[in-house]
């Protein structure tokens, strides 16, 4: 009986392992999810009609005409007349709609404005090491979402899935990146990965949003390569690493087939670090330049 139970458990474990999706299947699923995030979900990135980035002390007013979803825009003039007024003071966001206060919890979830129009806000880094808020206006009929043809990736190539040695940086210093909006954004250099690809030894820095080892559950590389601006997005691409357990890992798996473009490749409403680190290869893996792919 005991042996039978062990065999049954072992078979179940084998079947679970056997049923685990292959890397290429995960990649395909990720592309489908990315298409949804860009254009299909209620708060899809390409449904953003306007954005306001607030530093402490800033005020923004949402102007527009009822019944005209495309008319809603933010005004930095505190004297402007509009349906929504947002202020950030001492790190606290306050919002009023037609003069009535909006609950703080609603700001991060959904503030209805008009047919097909709502507003959502979240804390974000508005300058290097400076926290503020980002407020988006979503329009369900926004043309960019309607005309979206889907993301385009190079065909999956298992050669671009590599095992890498990770060397942590004990100091985890801050590094400031220029962004697509002309501002600065701060990340922490948490270490370097070393791997071999196409016969070349490559070292690539890794960055995280925190320098506290207890809070580091993932990190990313912002890289350029020989295809940057020549079939791959001109400001570089990103690749994320997670599922390594406790930081720091000794080795990690990097699948460059999952390398993706920053949101800024398709929308001006995000602040994305411009990649500075180089891979001296033509990386025919990951997402293509959206401006030339279709």
Predicted regions and their residues:
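Surface-exposed beta-loop interaction hotspot
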Residues: 126-187
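Acidic, glycine-rich flexible loop segments
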Residues: 222-258
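Extended, aromatic/histidine-rich regions of cofactor-dependent oxidoreductases associated
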Residues: 228, 251-253, 257-294
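Flexible, glycine-rich surface segments
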Residues: 165-227
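Positively charged n-region of N-terminal signal peptides that target proteins for export
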Residues: 1-5
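Bacterial N-terminal signal peptides
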Residues: 8-15
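Forkhead-associated
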Residues: 48, 53-108
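Bacterial Sec-dependent signal peptides at the C-terminal "C-region" and cleavage site
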Residues: 17-25
């Amino acid at each position: 009986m005991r042996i039978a139970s062990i065999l049954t458990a072992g078979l179940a474990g084998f079947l679970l392992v056997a049923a685990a999706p292959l890397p290429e299947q995960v990649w395909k699923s990720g592309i489908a999810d990315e298409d949804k995030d860009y254009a299909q979900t209620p708060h899809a990135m390409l449904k953003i009609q306007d954005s306001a980035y607030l530093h402490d002390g800033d005020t923004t007013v949402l102007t527009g005409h009822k019944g005209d979803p495309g008319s809603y825009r933010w005004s930095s003039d505190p004297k402007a007349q509009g349906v929504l007024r947002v202020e950030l003071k001492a790190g606290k966001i306050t919002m009023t709609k037609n003069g009535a206060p909006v609950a703080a919890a609603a700001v991060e979830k959904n503030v209805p404005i008009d047919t097909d129009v709502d507003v959502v806000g979240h804390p974000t880094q508005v300058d290097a090491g400076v926290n503020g808020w980002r407020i988006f206006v979503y329009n369900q009929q926004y043309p960019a979402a309607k005309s979206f043809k889907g993301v385009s990736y190079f065909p999956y190539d298992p050669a671009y899935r590599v095992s890498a040695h990770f060397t942590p940086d004990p100091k985890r210093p801050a590094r400031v990146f220029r962004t697509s909006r002309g501002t600065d954004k701060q990340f922490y250099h948490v270490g370097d990965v070393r791997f071999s690809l196409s016969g070349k030894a490559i070292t690539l820095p890794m960055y995280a949003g925190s320098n506290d080892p207890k809070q580091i559950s993932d990190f990313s590389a912002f890289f350029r390569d020989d295809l940057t601006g020549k079939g791959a997005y001109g400001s570089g691409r990103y690749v994320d690493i997670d599922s390594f357990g406790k930081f720091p890992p000794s080795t990690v798996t990097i699948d460059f087939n999952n390398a993706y473009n920053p949101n800024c490749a398709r929308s001006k409403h995000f602040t994305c670090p411009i990649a500075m680190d180089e891979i001296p290869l033509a990386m025919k893996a990951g997402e293509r330049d959206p401006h030339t792919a279709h």
